[in-house]
Curated annotation (Swiss-Prot):
Keywords annotated in UniProt: Ribonucleoprotein, Ribosomal protein, RNA-binding, rRNA-binding
Stated name of the protein: Large ribosomal subunit protein uL10
Primary role: Forms part of the ribosomal stalk, playing a central role in the interaction of the ribosome with GTP-bound translation factors.
PANTHER family: 39S RIBOSOMAL PROTEIN L10, MITOCHONDRIAL (PTHR11560)
Domain of life, source organism: Bacteria
Keyword RNA-binding belongs to the record: yes
Gene: rplJ
Chain segments annotated as coiled-coil in the UniProt record: none
GO BP field: translation
Pfam families: Ribosomal_L10
Keyword rRNA-binding: yes
Family: Belongs to the universal ribosomal protein uL10 family.
Annotated source species: Thermosipho melanesiensis (strain DSM 12029 / CIP 104789 / BI429)
Organism lineage string: Bacteria, Thermotogati, Thermotogota, Thermotogae, Thermotogales
Annotated HAMAP family: Ribosomal_uL10
GO cellular component, one term: large ribosomal subunit
């Protein structure tokens, strides 16, 4: 059991983390054993290095830390009932973290169950987790944008090179006629 001073320090630490986090996902870990939680943490570490963490946090501590970090917690009080584990992402792609925990949940028959999440400061309820898990990752989105921009440029280059080739053929034909 934590002393009051330890709880205050933990609230300070977590509020600083939550201020920097692009994703804060709330889940009920009941039904997961230590081995499964360790496996989830390992998967997060493999994909996102140390940018994402999955921690079991006392409801009152999480509530106070989020409130101190500037989140509107009064509207989401149902999140703070029952066992609570929080996945937060300080560095890296938050959508990738959502995909990892969602896929893990499918493997473990719906565990952990989702309570909701904050993504870039906006709250989404538990039903939105599946929709967010289907979004492309940041890398995939960047690749789509690059290929979308690259296509017209490539076409323009082909048109220019085709025009230059036609001009070159015409000039060569004129040169051949004059040399005859």
């Amino acid at each position: 059991m934590l002393t009051r001073k330890q709880k205050e320090l933990l609230v300070e630490e977590l509020s600083a983390i939550f201020e920097k986090s692009s994703l804060i996902l709330f889940s009920d870990y009941k039904g997961l054993n230590v081995e499964q939680i360790t496996k989830l943490r390992r998967k997060l570490r493999e994909k996102l290095a140390n940018g994402a963490r999955y921690r079991v946090i006392k409801n009152s501590v999480a509530y106070l830390a989020l409130k101190k970090a500037g989140y509107s917690v009064d509207e989401i009080e149902e999140v703070f009932s029952g066992p609570l584990a929080i996945l937060y992402v300080e560095e890296g792609d938050p959508i990738e973290a959502i995909k990892i925990i969602y896929d893990f949940s499918k493997e473990t028959k719906g565990l952990p169950s989702f309570k909701g999440l904050y993504l870039d400061g906006r709250f989404f309820d538990a039903e939105e987790v599946e929709n967010l898990s289907k979004l492309p990752s940041k890398e995939q989105l960047l690749a789509m944008v690059v290929s979308g921009v690259q296509g017209p440029i490539r076409g323009f280059v082909n048109v220019l090179s085709g025009t230059l080739k036609s001009l070159l053929y015409a000039l060569n034909a004129i040169k051949d006629k004059k040399s005859e």
